[in-house]
């Protein structure tokens, strides 16, 4: 019951709240009162990235200092993807306005790349529980790139993911992949990343 009242820090928070935000953005011309809801969400979104945990509810801090997320790649990608979809929609409906800074976004390309397992064939990822090794984070990487983060590591990562390698991907034969796949011709052969990384 407590989780249903307070899911801050969990990937479902951004899923539920940000999809509601996109719905509100689509209705703001017909229902002026939803503009206030949109702005409340926009102002609250950084709190999800900043969530420091909750000792009483035994909830971990969402992101560590190196940018790692405790829910591993699959669930981190899901929560981040939902947040970035709302952020892009907010920017598109608020031309010229400053969307504000979310410092954790800058560390995500490194995190997603450090928890993948490059190999011959499709990219594998380090996950836990009910996640599959084929799940990747190209959707969040594409949205980060679309938001102006032109990190070559993003291009490398996306170029390693095979088309159709998992069910939730942003692939070229799907609308989001068609719209947001960047030009991968300049993807580096190897990303400029440390050879090891600790997330804690």
Task: Give the positions of each predicted feature.
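Carbohydrate-active enzyme catalytic cores, enriched for enzymes
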Residues: 74-200
């Amino acid at each position: 019951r407590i989780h249903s009242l307070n899911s801050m820090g969990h990937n479902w928070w951004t899923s539920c709240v940000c999809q509601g935000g996109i719905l509100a953005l689509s209705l703001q011309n017909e229902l002026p009162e939803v503009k206030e809801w949109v702005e409340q969400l926009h102002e609250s979104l950084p709190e999800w990235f900043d969530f420091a945990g909750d000792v009483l509810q035994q909830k971990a801090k969402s992101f560590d200092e190196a940018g790692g997320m405790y829910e591993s790649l699959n669930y981190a990608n899901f929560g981040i993807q939902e947040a970035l979809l709302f952020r892009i929609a907010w920017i598109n409906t608020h031309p010229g306005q400053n969307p504000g800074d979310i410092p954790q976004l800058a560390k995500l390309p490194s995190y997603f790349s450090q928890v993948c397992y490059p190999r011959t064939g499709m990219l594998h990822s380090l996950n836990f529980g009910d996640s599959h090794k084929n799940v990747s984070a190209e959707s969040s990487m594409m949205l980060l790139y679309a938001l102006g983060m032109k990190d070559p590591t993003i291009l490398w990562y996306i170029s390693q993911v095979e088309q159709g390698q998992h069910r939730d991907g942003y692939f070229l034969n799907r609308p989001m992949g068609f719209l947001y796949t960047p030009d991968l011709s300049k993807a580096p052969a190897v990303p400029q990343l440390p050879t090891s990384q600790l997330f804690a």
